[in-house]
Amino acid sequence: MESIVDKQAVKHFLLQLQDKICQQLEATDGQAQFIEDAWQREPGEKLGGGGRTRVMREGAVFEQGGVNFSHVFGEQMPASATAHRPELAGRRFEAMGVSLVMHPKNPYVPTSHANVRFFIAEKEGEAPIWWFGGGFDLTPFYPFVEDGQHWHQTAKNICAPFGSEIYNEHKAWCDRYFYLPHRNETRGIGGLFFDDLNEWSFEQCFAYMQAVGEGYTQAYVPIVEKRKNTPFTERERQFQLYRRGRYVEFNLVLDRGTLFGLQTGGRTESILMSMPPLARWEYAYQPQAGTPEAKLSEFLVPREW
């Protein structure tokens, strides 16, 4: 039996999720608050819809971060999307999601990213084509094994009710996706990543997306609380800025969401919200052997946690 697709329930959940995550991150920071920029597409634009971009700046813990909700729709998919999925041609579509990136001030606190999204393409008289996607991943500068274990154990616990292989599959997908081939390293220590999820019933797929979205703060906040008061010097700060450069490289060169958004006339400020406020590059930099900075490379390969 075809399950009922409830777009409104998904949108309601995503708006609540944005509120909840912002509240939890504000409590963790203890100083700064998210400033909301609500936006709407102009009439006559290719895409309709709008969203709520929320940005935190110069907090006690977070140097900058953003939690974005968007819901956009159009009469037909861009050619770049239908080239790979011809069944989407001639269908009106809607895409909605919450995406976030948090860039902490303290180099001992990892950067984190999370995203959950829903896509549906509809045509009169035909069954809708829909899927869910999402995940979360962690990018430490000074990694701790116990933090990685907590992050991945939380991910395992989220996946367990949905099947014994889900964690392994979505963890491996995350390792493959957040990989910089020109640097031969992963962006961080991974987590979960999934896309095109529609093989279960709508209810089951939606439940998994909800679990991943709500699991992000369970995975991240305890690590932030543990590391946010660690003393650091200018050396660690400079290394953090250098490593943020890799984050920029991934987002601008490789990230499908960023590229799709910019190529299809998405809202540029919201798309580039994920960028760090400061980053640096240094020609042919190599950390000295035996230093904490050199240790990071051991973590930037897929591993079992």
UniProtKB/Swiss-Prot annotation:
Keywords from the UniProt entry = Cytoplasm, Heme biosynthesis, Metal-binding, Oxidoreductase, Porphyrin biosynthesis
Q: Which PROSITE patterns match?
A: COPROGEN_OXIDASE (PS01021)
Chief location bin? cytoplasm
Task: Give the UniProt record's GO annotations in the biological process aspect.
Answer: protoporphyrinogen IX biosynthetic process
Record-listed a divalent metal cation binding positions: 103, 113, 152, 182
Q: In which pathway does it act?
A: Porphyrin-containing compound metabolism; protoporphyrin-IX biosynthesis; protoporphyrinogen-IX from coproporphyrinogen-III (O2 route): step 1/1
GO cellular component: a single term:
cytoplasm
TM ranges are: none
Recorded hits in Pfam families, A to Z, give: Coprogen_oxidas
What positions constitute the catalytic site? Answer: 113 (proton donor)
**Which residues are listed for substrate binding in this entry?**
99, 115-117, 265-267
Q: What is its EC number?
A: 1.3.3.3
Fill in the subunit field for this protein. Answer: Homodimer.
Q: What is this protein called?
A: Oxygen-dependent coproporphyrinogen-III oxidase
Per the UniProt record, the source organism is Vibrio cholerae serotype O1 (strain ATCC 39315 / El Tor Inaba N16961)
